[in-house]
Curated annotation (Swiss-Prot):
Signal peptide (residue range): none
Gene: yycJ
Cofactor, free-text remark: Binds 2 metal ions per subunit. The endogenous metal is unknown.
MF-aspect GO terms: exonuclease activity; metal ion binding
Family of the protein in this entry: Belongs to the metallo-beta-lactamase superfamily.
A Pfam entry, by short name: Lactamase_B
UniProt entry tagged with the keyword Nuclease: yes
Chain sites annotated for binding a divalent metal cation 2: D62, H63, D145
Species, as recorded: Bacillus subtilis (strain 168)
Name of this chain's protein: Exodeoxyribonuclease YycJ
Lineage, broadest ranks: Bacteria, Bacillati, Bacillota, Bacilli, Bacillales
Residues where a divalent metal cation 1 binds: H58, H60, H123, D145
Stored PANTHER family: EXODEOXYRIBONUCLEASE WALJ, METALLO-HYDROLASE YYCJ-RELATED
Cofactor or coenzyme needed: Fe(2+); Zn(2+); Mn(2+)
Amino acid sequence: MSLQFSVLASGSTGNAFYLETEDHAFLVDAGLSGKAMDGLMAQIGRKLDDVDGIFVTHEHSDHIKGLGVVARKYKLPIYANEKTWKAMENQIGKIDTDQKFVFPMETVKSFGGLDVESFGVSHDAAEPMFYVFHYSGRKLALMTDTGYVSDRMKGIIRSANVFVFESNHDVGMLQMGRYPWSIKRRILSDVGHVSNEDAALAMTDVIGDETSRIYLAHLSQDNNMKELARMSVQQTLASKGFVTGETFDLYDTDPKKATPLCAV
């Protein structure tokens, strides 16, 4: 038995993740149009009507843009905490009552042999949370959209086999870039986004003996580059004794191209 997943899209313009077991298939977020979501699923040889439900992280548009359309078209259950439901209801349109499920923060829901654990992050949304998936002794941890990584968060995601980890910006590029200071300050704040270097430092506290893959996610298209993010993370990890390519590898994500479906 295996848990498989793909980062369908990740970046400032839209985010969506897919995972499946032998018995179930789920999305985490649907931050692109319904048409784009169809196309991304086709890239990995899957269809949206194969999906059993959608877990929502928070109400920002780059995570829920296509949520209402996809859920209505395919009659999919949506799982989100109460504050996120209240914050996003006007954005996603009418959802039938029997498709609306409350998934409280810091709880676990089970779907067959798949255990889904929610945990809070630090972001400027109503009640943002991400997820850890446990299946057949394997662990997949998703965590983006957080201004910092607390010890509590580290304890929850520690020793995952696969991480999807925010590596949003290069601080120098952000500071010298075109954004107004108010937006720069928000991104750099404790409720903003994690930089390349801070992401790598957090990784050094959570990488385990069985960690095999780390996906660098939610890269800013204005304040980061794939090559820069990878180099910065590799250098910071190496300075702490973690050598990429020995026991684990780093992988890029893209706002328009899904990563290959792979086993956790």
